[in-house]
């Protein structure tokens, strides 16, 4: 039941991870330190699920490095991808439009109220001081928004009136600001009167004397999204204010319009009316169709010309004040627009950090923890950042099918807690990392499976050995897109080649144009995979074929790209020879094992601040170029190939040499066969004189047939050797004839005199065996005749092996015994001369054979 529960829980988690609405994950980042101390990094691929984001502040992604908040936040796109946003300089012009984005906005509290210097203050101090104060006020307006404080009197009214005038420029007004002291005093008096009337009007409407300005300011360049909770009461009060000021027919929607570009603007619905409208009609907000854009709203103006006086004098004063202020604000607005056009800021999106930005993160050598948080911790994604030195080689390993025994079952069985990894893989990779190599785990899984993949690699333990830590590089695509590329299209090498080339460019930025794989500089030392696509990916980035290992489902490791693919091994056997395949990395040219750091290739202190570029002169380059791979036991000790443009002359010379060799071999074969036939005839003459009877006739016939066959062979060779016809015989026929006559060219050569002795000995042994077999047959027949008995009787003194079975009668009758003895004696007398004659004949015959078969010393010496 435990396995069932684990399986159900894992399936539910996997199904939820496949859902695009909840898919989240981040890919590990690699930072490479160069000899001059410069840092370069791989992309920050961070993906969140499709959360329901209502506020622009929720798009801000906080980045924590080693549990410390960094000062470089990221922004979340609508698709769930996070990216950095940086301001571009004026010198950057050729940037695609799709990379231009709005800045990162966050929920910030409203700016605190602070007293500001009005342009109307200090009027008696002279014109120069007034101009300085005017510039100071303009700078304040551009930097931060201004807010209306109802409790302020006097100066605040002039400030608000200045803001109101700046928002409603008129085209017809061309008056200049007051320069004399009298004009300034007149403007100041009118401002005070306007402020008093405005405060009296707001008090009658029962607007609160103090508004809550502690709400969040939610502004984004992509659009204005107000806070509904804070703006609800204000909308009601604004409607009541418009009703009291402009009548019952006034609607807030009539003041807000949208232009063709989608910008929201405030317009004057009564612009067709004149300024001298009768009392009771809404006053003129702006003339000549003046509009207010979103920039004006963000500048902080929240109030327009809302006052309306029942008396004519007040209306005249207010009208003159509005004209003066509108002319002043028109001049100021033109200056501000020109200045803003020159200093317009543009923001670009990116997923990489520069050298200066990386140095601000306070990184350490080896492994660093990354955490990405959205909306104050509602969604958190974690990953790792590895800082590596430029001179430490990398060993790549696939995960599915390379660490696991199969692609599919590696996912399924790992969910229920069953170990489905190859034996010895943890021990081998641990030894490789101990020798000073960096381990890189590469897989075509999607970024949403990053957490599950890392947890699986950390859980592998075999006989006390675990896999070493290393970056897990996954596909930045979603799960369905990654599965389609790997399962349906069966092209995982498309992602792997692009990813490895990107990592390689971190080490060698100036070698991107190298096309030849043999000449390509690469930081990768070896690669492990389970398919031919993995081998092709590793070979594309410059890994030699002799260091690309492919493992099958049975645990056999072989080198698939080598021409001699008969090499078979395993992780356990490679672990025994790990120092041969992966020699220890030397960090110092004097001492090879002086490094005491736990991080491969890093100094013991593990800090980036203590880097000294002068020590790189004494360091030795650890990357083995592909040129060194040409001088191995497999490649270097081969016979060099002849570099000749035209091979036709060589083919003709080879054909002539073959013909000459054929002629020589034919002549040698003829002479050898002739000598063998002569010696065979000499050997067969000796038994021909002494053999009698039928046996002698057979031997004579056999000897004569051998001589005839030998003579025929000699004649055939002599005829073929005397008149060789090269024109009618092809090269194939010549080679076949050489093979039939000389044997296989791979066989060991034999000396001619040894062949002659072998032939002579074989003929002699053959003749001797025939003679011995015929003599033995004759003697056996005679022995059987000699020992045969016709009648059975009592046992006698002469006992033979054949007569033992007949000695079964009793010995009771002496007469019978005497008779039997007499008959036996008579029979013995009759047979004895005959047997003696046979023995003499046999001895003489054997002696003759021995005399005939003796070696002739003269013949042997010849």
UniProtKB/Swiss-Prot annotation:
In which residue ranges is the amino acid composition biased (Low complexity)?
161-179, 300-313, 710-730
Give compartment(s).
Cytoplasm; Nucleus membrane; Endoplasmic reticulum membrane
User: Ranges of Acidic residues compositional bias?
Assistant: 651-663, 849-862
Task: Supply one GO BP term.
Answer: aerobic respiration
Q: Effect of altering residue 80 to R? A: Impairs phosphatidate phosphatase activity
The record describes its post-translational modification as: Acetylation at Lys-496 and Lys-801 by ESA1 promotes synthesis of diacylglycerol. Phosphorylated by CDC28 at the onset of mitosis, and dephosphorylated by the NEM1-SPO7 complex. Phosphorylation regulates recruitment on promoters of lipid biosynthetic enzymes.
PTM-bearing positions, type Phosphoserine: 110, 114, 168, 511, 602, 744, 748, 773-774, 810, 814, 844, 847
**Residue(s) carrying N6-acetyllysine:** 496, 801
GO molecular-function terms, A-Z:
phosphatidate phosphatase activity; transcription cis-regulatory region binding
Summarizing the annotation, the consequence of altering residue 15 to A is:
Impairs membrane recruitiment
Biased-composition ranges, Basic and acidic residues, are 132-143, 836-848
Name the chain's protein.
Phosphatidic acid phosphohydrolase 1
């Amino acid at each position: 039941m435990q396995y069932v529960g684990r399986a159900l829980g894992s399936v539910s988690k996997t199904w939820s991870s496949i859902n695009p609405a909840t898919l989240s994950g981040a890919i590990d980042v690699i930072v490479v330190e160069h000899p001059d101390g410069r840092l370069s990094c791989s992309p920050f691929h961070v993906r969140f699920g499709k959360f329901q984001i209502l506020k622009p502040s929720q798009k801000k992604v906080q980045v924590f490095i080693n549990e410390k908040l960094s000062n470089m936040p990221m922004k979340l796109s609508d698709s769930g991808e996070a990216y950095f946003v940086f301001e571009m300089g004026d010198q950057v012009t050729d940037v695609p439009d799709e990379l231009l984005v709005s800045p990162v906005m966050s929920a910030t509290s409203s700016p605190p109220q602070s007293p500001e210097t009005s342009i109307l203050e200090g009027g008696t101090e002279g014109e120069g001081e007034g101009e300085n104060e005017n510039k100071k006020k303009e700078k304040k307006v551009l930097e931060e928004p201004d807010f209306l404080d109802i409790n302020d009197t006097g100066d605040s009214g002039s400030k608000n009136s200045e803001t109101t005038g700046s928002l409603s420029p008129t085209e017809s007004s061309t008056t200049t600001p007051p320069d004399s002291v009298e004009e300034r005093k007149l403007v100041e008096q009118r401002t005070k009167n306007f402020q008093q009337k405005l405060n009296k009007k707001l008090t009658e409407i029962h607007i609160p004397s103090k508004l809550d300005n502690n709400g969040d300011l939610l502004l984004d360049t992509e659009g204005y999204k107000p806070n509904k909770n804070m703006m609800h009461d204000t909308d009601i009060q604004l409607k009541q204010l418009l009703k009291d000021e402009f009548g019952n027919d006034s609607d807030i929607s009539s003041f807000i319009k949208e232009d063709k570009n989608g910008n929201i603007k405030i317009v004057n619905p009564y612009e067709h009316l004149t300024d001298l409208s009768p009392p009771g009609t809404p006053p003129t907000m702006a003339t000549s169709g003046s509009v207010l854009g979103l920039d004006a709203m963000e500048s902080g103006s929240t109030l327009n010309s809302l006052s309306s006086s029942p008396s004519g004098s007040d209306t005249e004063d207010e009208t003159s004040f509005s004209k003066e202020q509108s002319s002043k604000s028109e001049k100021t607005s033109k200056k501000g627009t020109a200045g803003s056009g020159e200093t317009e800021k543009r923001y670009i999106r990116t997923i990489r950090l520069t050298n200066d930005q990386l140095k601000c993160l306070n990184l350490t050598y080896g492994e660093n923890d990354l955490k990405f948080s959205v909306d104050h911790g509602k969604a958190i994604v974690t990953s790792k950042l590895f800082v590596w030195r430029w001179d430490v080689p990398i060993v790549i390993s696939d995960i599915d099918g390379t660490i696991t025994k199969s692609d599919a079952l590696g996912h399924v069985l790992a969910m229920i807690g069953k170990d489905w990894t190859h034996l010895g893989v943890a021990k081998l990779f641990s030894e490789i990392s101990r020798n000073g190599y960096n381990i890189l785990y590469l897989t075509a899984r999607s970024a949403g499976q990053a957490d599950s993949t890392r947890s699986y690699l950390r859980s592998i333990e075999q006989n006390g050995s675990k896999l070493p830590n290393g970056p897990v590089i996954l596909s930045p695509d979603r799960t369905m897109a990654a599965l389609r590329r790997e399962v349906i299209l069966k092209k995982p090498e498309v992602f792997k080649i692009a990813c490895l080339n990107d990592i390689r460019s971190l080490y060698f930025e100036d070698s991107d144009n190298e096309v030849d794989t043999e000449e390509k500089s690469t930081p990768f030392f070896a690669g492990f995979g389970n398919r031919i696509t993995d081998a092709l990916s590793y070979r594309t980035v410059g890994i030699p074929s002799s260091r690309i290992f492919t493992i099958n489902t049975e645990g056999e490791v072989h080198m698939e790209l080598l021409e001699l693919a008969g090499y078979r091994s395993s992780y356990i056997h490679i672990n025994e020879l790990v120092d041969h395949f992966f020699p220890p990395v030397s960090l110092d040219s004097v001492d090879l094992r002086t490094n005491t750091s736990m991080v491969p290739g890093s100094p013991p202190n593990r800090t980036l601040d203590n880097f000294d570029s002068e020590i790189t002169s004494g360091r030795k380059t650890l990357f083995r170029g592909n040129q060194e791979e040409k001088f191995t036991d497999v490649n270097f000790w081969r016979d060099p190939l002849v570099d000749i443009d035209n091979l036709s002359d060589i083919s003709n010379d080879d054909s002539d040499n073959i013909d000459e060799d054929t002629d020589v071999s034919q002549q040698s074969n003829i002479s050898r066969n002739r000598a063998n036939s002569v010696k065979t005839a000499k050997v067969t003459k000796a038994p021909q004189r002494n053999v009698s009877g039928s046996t002698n006739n057979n031997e004579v016939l056999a000897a004569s047939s051998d001589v005839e066959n030998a003579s025929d062979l000699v004649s055939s060779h002599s005829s073929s050797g005397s008149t060789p016809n090269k024109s009618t015989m092809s090269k194939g026929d010549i080679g076949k004839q050489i093979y039939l006559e000389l044997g296989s060219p791979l066989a060991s050569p034999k000396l001619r005199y040894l062949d002659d002795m072998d032939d002579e000995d074989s003929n002699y042994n053959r003749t001797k065996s025939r003679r011995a077999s015929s003599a033995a047959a004759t003697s056996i027949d005679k022995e059987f005749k000699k020992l045969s008995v016709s009648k059975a009787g009592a046992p006698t003194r002469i006992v033979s092996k054949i007569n033992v079975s007949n000695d079964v009668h009793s010995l009771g009758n002496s007469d019978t015994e005497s008779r039997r003895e007499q008959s036996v004696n008579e029979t013995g007398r009759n047979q004895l001369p005959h047997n003696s004659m046979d023995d003499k004949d046999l001895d003489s015959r054997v002696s003759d054979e021995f005399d005939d078969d003796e070696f002739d010393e003269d013949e042997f010496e010849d």
